[in-house]
């Protein structure tokens, strides 16, 4: 009987020491998960630090993003993405100017009209 109680006490102590995902801290009304780093397919929320703390991020999985589009998620604008956006706008302007040439060659059915859209680095 004493060995049974001792075994039970050891298992109860070991159950508390086991590391793993027994409890996952949630954020943004149980939409996101608090993690140190987000996976590439997950979106990092700006307002998740309230629930997760300063050292963790609130990561929203891709399958839950479509169901809850109302929360605020900001993607970071980098210098590379701004340069790429400007290059795309320049290409679109060039393609729009080349449309009369496409009409004379009979390729108008393959060409769609593109308009240059300005990109601000703050959004």
Swiss-Prot record:
Query: What's the PTM story here?
Result: O-glycosylated; glycans contain sialic acids alpha(2,3)-linked to galactose and N-acetylgalactosamine. The C-terminal O-glycosylation contributes substantially to the sperm glyocalyx.
InterPro entries named among the record's database cross-references? Beta-defensin
Classification of source organism: Eukaryota, Metazoa, Chordata, Craniata, Vertebrata
The molecular function GO annotations come to: peptidase inhibitor activity
Its main subcellular localisation, reduced to a broad class, is: secreted
Instruction: Give me the disulphide-bonded residues.
Output: 27-58, 34-52, 38-59
Cite the residue spans of the region called In vitro binds to LPS, mediates antimicrobial activity and inhibits LPS-mediated inflammation. Answer: 21-63
* Top-rank taxon, per record: Eukaryota
Tissue localization of expression:
High-level and epididymis-specific expression. Detected in epithelial cells lining the efferent ductules, initial segment, and cauda regions of the epididymis, but not on spermatozoa.
Per the UniProt entry, the signal peptide is 1-20
What functional role does this protein have? Highly glycosylated atypical beta-defensin involved in several aspects of sperm function. Facilitates sperm transport in the female reproductive tract and contributes to sperm protection against immunodetection; both functions are probably implicating the negative surface charge provided by its O-linked oligosaccharides in the sperm glycocalyx. Involved in binding of sperm to oviductal epithelial cells to form a sperm reservoir until ovulation.
Q: Where in the cell is it found?
A: Secreted
> What's the protein called, per UniProt?
Beta-defensin 126
Organism from which the protein derives: Macaca fascicularis (Crab-eating macaque)
Which keywords describe this protein according to UniProt?
Answer: Antibiotic, Antimicrobial, Cleavage on pair of basic residues, Defensin, Disulfide bond, Fertilization, Secreted, Signal
What quaternary structure, including any partners, is listed in this protein's UniProt entry?
Answer: Homodimer or homooligomer; disulfide-linked.
Q: Which family does it belong to?
A: Belongs to the beta-defensin family.
Cellular component annotations (GO), alphabetically ordered: extracellular region
List GO BP terms, alphabetically: antimicrobial humoral immune response mediated by antimicrobial peptide; defense response to Gram-negative bacterium; proteolysis; single fertilization
């Amino acid at each position: 009987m004493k060995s049974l109680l001792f075994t039970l006490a050891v298992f109860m102590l070991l159950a508390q020491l086991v590391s793993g995902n027994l409890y996952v801290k949630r954020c943004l009304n149980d939409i996101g998960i608090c993690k140190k780093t987000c996976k590439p397919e997950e979106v990092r929320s700006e307002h998740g630090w309230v629930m997760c703390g300063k050292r963790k991020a609130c990561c929203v999985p891709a399958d839950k993003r479509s169901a809850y589009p109302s929360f605020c998620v900001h993607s970071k604008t980098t210098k590379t993405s701004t340069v790429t956006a400007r290059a795309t706008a320049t290409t679109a302007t060039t393609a729009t100017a080349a449309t009369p040439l496409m009409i004379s060659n009979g390729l108008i059915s393959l060409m769609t009209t593109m308009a240059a859209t300005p990109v601000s680095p703050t959004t």
